[in-house]
C-alpha cells in the first residue's frame, strides 16, 4: 500500500490511479334516441372486447423524456407523530397509496442502505435493508450523527458527529462495532467520500470557508487541500475510477456541480459540469459503474433530480432532493422533502419509472448511502445494545393534566418566564413548547424563546387581515420575536413547495468556536431591501442576500420539526405585507384540524358568532352655523 507521502505527490503531480312543430320535433328526437340506444346495445360487446384486448396486450405508456418536472405531492395525513417515533427502537416506514401500475419493482432487496434521520431533537444512523423490515438503529445518544458513507468493501461506515463537541469524522466497523475517531480539530468536518480502493477520504471542512480535504484513512495523514478557493466548495464525491472528484461550489455565483480532474493542473483541473444559472444544484453522486452522475436541483418551485452523462448532458429523472445509486447503477433512491415531512422514493435510472412508492420517513434526512454488502448477522454485541435503545421525547404528548371534564374542554396553561401579550398555551402543548425552548437554548447558547411576539391570542383580539382562522387562536401556536433579525442573529431562507412559500429559520450560535451549530450553505432572504427605495425590491418583498452568512448557525426549523412543531406557509400577500410572511409562526396540531382545536377551548356558539371588530371612532366634525346679521328696526 502506498504511503501518505506517495499519495500526496501522485495527486499533486497528476499520476494518481486509484398530464317544424313541437310534436314533430319530439318524434324526431325520440326516434333518434331509440336508434342510438339500439346501436349502443349492438356495439357495446364489440367495444368491450376491443378495449380489454388492448389493455391486456399493451402496457400503460410512461413518458421518459419529460419537458417539465412533475412534483410528487405527498398525502398530508400519512405522517408519524413524535410520540410514535420515540416509542420504537425499530422504526417502521409508512407507505403512501400508489397505483400498482406505477411501481416497477422493489429496489431495496439487495445491499444495505444507511440513513441519517433527525428524530426527537437529534440525528442518528439507521440501517434500512428492505420494505419488509423496519429501520435498525446503529447509533444513539445526546449528539448528532450525519452524512454516512459506506466503504467500497461494505465493512466501514464513515460519518460526521458532534459527540465530542466540534464536528469530527468517525469510522464505525460494522463487523466488530468498534468506533474510531478520524479527525480531532475545532473545524466543522462532514460529508466523507471514499476513494475506490478504500484508502483515502475526501470531505468538506469549514474554517471561515468550505474547502475539500483529502486524507488517508489508516495512517492519519492529511494529504491535500484540494480546492483552496475563496468560494465555498463542499459535498465531494469520488469517481469510481479514482481519477476525478465532483463537488458543489458557488464559484460562478450560485451552487453548481464542479469536477476536479487529477490529470490536469492549475485552473485546468476544475470545470463546471451543470452550467445552469437558473438552478441551484446539490448532492452530486457518481454511479458505481462510473458512467454517470446524479444530482438534485432546485429550479423556481421544482425539486428535481438529473442524471448527467459526459456525451448526453443532463436529463430530468423525477422529483427529489438527495439521490444515491444502488450498487448496480440501475436505481436512484432519493429523499424528497415536503414542507413538514420527508419521503423516500426511487426511480429506474434508464426510463425514469417509479421504482419505489413514496414512503413517509419518521424524520428529515441528514445523509444516506448505499452499499452492496448487507449488515453482518449476527450483529456485534455493541451494535445489538444500540438497536434495543429507545429514545424518549422530553415531554409526554396528549391531554393536559387540568382537562375540564365537565364540558369536555381543556384550559390554557401559563408559560413560566416567557414574555408575550398573553403568555399562555393550550394545556396539551405547553410542555412541548418548554421542551423546544430548552432544546434551542442548549443548541444556540441563548434563550431564544423567552420572548414571544404572540402565544395564545383570544378571539377578542383581531389579527391582521387574512389571519381570521390562524392557529394562534387555538392556543397551539406561537410566533417568536422578530427583533433579533435586526441584530443579524436570525435569518430566513425561502423554500418553495408547489405554489406556497415556506421559510427555514436559522439562529446564530452564541459560541462561534465550532461547538454549536453548523455552517450555512444557503443565502438568506433580505426583508430590509423592501425599504431601500427600489420599486422592484418593494414589490417582491425584499431580495436574496449578498452571500452566505459566515459562522455557525442552528437550524431552528429542523429542531422544531423533530419535536412535532410545524411551520405555516406565507400568505399570498406576503410580498406587500411583512406580517403575511409568517416566517416566525409554528404550531403543534396533535392530529387535530383548526376547527377541532378551537372546540377544545370554545363552545360552538362562540365560533358561530362573528369575531367582534370594534368600529372606528367617528371623526368629529364641526356643526355648520350661519352668521346672524342684525338689521336696524324701522
Predicted segments with their positions:
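Catalytic cores and adjacent binding grooves of peptidoglycan-active enzymes
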Residues: 46-48, 486-627, 634
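Second-shell loop/turn segments in exported
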Residues: 415-427, 465-467, 537-549
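Acidic helix-start/capping segments at beta-turn-to-alpha-helix junctions
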Residues: 445-466, 573-580
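Structural recognition of the beta-strand scaffold that forms the well-ordered cores
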Residues: 448-451, 477-482, 567-570, 585
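Mid-length scaffold segments of soluble, non-membrane domains
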Residues: 470-492
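Active-site acidic/histidine clusters and adjacent loop/turn architecture
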Residues: 370, 375-451
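Extracellular/periplasmic catalytic domains that process cell-envelope and extracellular macromolecules
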Residues: 107, 469-475, 560
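Sequence signature of WD/YWTD-type beta-propeller architectures
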Residues: 2-16, 22-398
Amino acid at each position: 500500500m502506498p504511503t501518505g507521502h506517495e499519495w500526496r505527490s501522485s495527486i499533486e503531480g497528476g499520476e494518481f490511479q486509484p398530464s317544424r312543430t313541437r310534436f314533430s320535433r319530439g318524434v324526431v328526437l325520440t326516434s333518434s334516441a331509440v336508434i342510438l340506444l339500439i346501436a349502443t346495445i349492438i356495439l357495446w360487446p364489440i367495444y368491450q372486447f376491443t378495449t380489454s384486448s388492448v389493455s391486456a396486450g399493451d402496457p400503460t405508456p410512461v413518458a421518459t423524456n419529460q419537458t417539465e418536472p412533475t412534483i410528487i405531492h405527498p398525502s398530508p395525513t400519512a405522517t408519524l407523530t413524535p410520540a410514535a417515533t420515540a416509542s420504537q427502537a425499530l422504526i417502521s416506514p409508512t407507505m403512501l397509496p400508489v397505483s400498482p401500475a406505477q411501481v416497477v419493482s422493489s429496489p431495496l432487496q439487495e445491499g444495505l442502505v444507511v440513513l441519517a434521520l433527525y428524530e426527537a431533537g437529534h440525528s442518528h444512523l439507521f440501517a434500512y435493508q428492505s420494505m419488509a423490515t423496519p429501520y435498525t438503529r446503529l447509533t444513539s445518544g445526546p449528539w448528532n450523527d450525519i452524512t454516512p458513507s459506506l466503504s467500497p468493501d461494505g465493512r466501514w461506515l464513515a460519518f460526521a458527529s458532534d459527540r465530542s463537541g466540534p464536528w469530527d469524522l468517525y469510522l464505525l466497523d460494522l463487523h466488530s462495532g468498534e468506533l474510531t475517531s478520524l479527525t480531532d480539530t475545532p473545524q466543522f468536518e462532514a460529508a466523507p467520500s471514499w476513494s475506490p480502493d478504500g484508502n483515502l477520504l475526501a470531505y468538506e471542512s469549514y474554517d471561515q470557508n468550505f474547502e475539500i480535504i483529502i486524507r488517508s484513512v489508516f495512517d492519519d495523514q492529511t494529504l491535500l487541500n484540494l480546492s483552496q478557493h475563496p468560494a465555498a466548495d463542499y459535498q465531494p464525491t469520488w469517481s469510481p475510477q479514482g481519477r476525478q472528484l465532483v463537488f458543489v461550489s458557488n464559484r460562478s455565483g450560485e451552487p453548481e456541480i464542479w469536477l476536479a480532474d487529477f490529470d490536469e493542473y492549475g485552473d485546468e483541473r476544475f470545470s463546471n459540469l451543470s452550467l445552469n444559472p437558473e438552478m441551484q444544484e446539490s448532492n452530486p453522486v457518481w454511479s458505481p459503474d462510473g458512467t454517470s452522475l446524479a444530482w438534485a436541483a432546485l429550479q423556481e418551485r421544482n425539486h428535481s433530480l438529473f442524471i448527467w452523462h459526459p456525451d448526453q448532458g443532463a436529463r430530468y429523472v423525477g422529483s427529489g432532493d438527495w439521490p444515491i445509486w444502488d450498487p448496480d447503477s440501475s436505481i436512484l433512491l432519493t429523499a424528497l422533502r415536503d414542507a413538514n415531512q420527508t419521503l423516500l422514493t426511487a426511480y429506474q435510472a434508464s426510463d425514469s419509472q417509479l421504482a419505489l412508492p413514496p414512503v413517509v420517513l419518521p424524520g428529515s434526512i441528514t445523509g444516506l448511502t448505499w452499499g452492496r454488502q448487507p449488515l453482518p448477522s449476527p450483529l456485534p454485541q455493541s451494535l445489538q445494545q444500540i438497536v434495543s435503545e429507545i429514545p424518549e421525547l422530553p415531554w409526554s404528548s396528549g391531554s393536559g393534566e387540568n382537562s375540564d371534564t365537565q364540558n369536555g374542554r381543556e384550559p390554557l396553561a401559563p408559560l413560566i418566564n416567557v414574555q408575550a401579550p398573553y403568555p399562555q398555551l393550550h394545556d396539551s402543548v405547553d410542555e412541548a413548547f418548554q421542551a423546544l425552548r430548552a432544546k434551542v437554548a442548549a443548541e444556540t447558547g441563548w434563550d431564544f424563546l423567552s420572548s414571544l411576539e404572540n402565544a395564545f391570542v383570544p378571539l377578542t383580539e383581531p389579527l391582521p387581515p387574512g389571519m381570521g382562522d390562524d392557529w394562534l387562536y387555538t392556543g397551539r401556536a406561537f410566533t417568536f420575536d422578530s427583533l433579533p433579525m435586526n441584530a443579524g442573529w436570525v435569518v430566513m431562507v425561502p423554500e418553495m413547495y408547489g405554489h406556497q412559500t415556506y421559510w427555514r429559520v436559522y439562529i446564530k450560535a452564541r459560541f462561534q468556536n465550532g461547538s454549536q451549530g453548523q455552517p450555512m450553505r444557503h443565502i438568506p432572504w433580505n426583508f430590509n431591501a423592501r425599504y431601500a427605495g427600489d420599486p422592484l425590491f418593494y414589490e417582491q418583498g425584499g431580495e436574496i442576500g449578498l452571500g452566505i452568512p459566515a459562522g455557525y448557525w442552528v437550524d431552528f426549523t429542523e429542531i422544531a420539526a423533530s419535536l412535532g412543531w410545524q411551520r405555516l406557509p406565507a400568505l399570498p400577500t406576503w410580498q406587500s405585507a411583512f406580517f403575511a410572511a409568517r416566517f416566525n409562526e409554528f404550531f403543534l396540531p396533535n392530529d387535530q384540524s383548526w376547527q377541532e382545536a378551537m372546540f377544545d377551548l370554545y363552545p360552538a356558539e362562540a365560533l358561530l358568532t362573528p369575531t367582534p371588530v370594534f368600529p372606528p371612532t367617528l371623526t368629529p366634525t364641526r356643526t355648520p352655523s350661519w352668521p346672524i346679521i342684525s338689521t336696524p328696526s324701522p
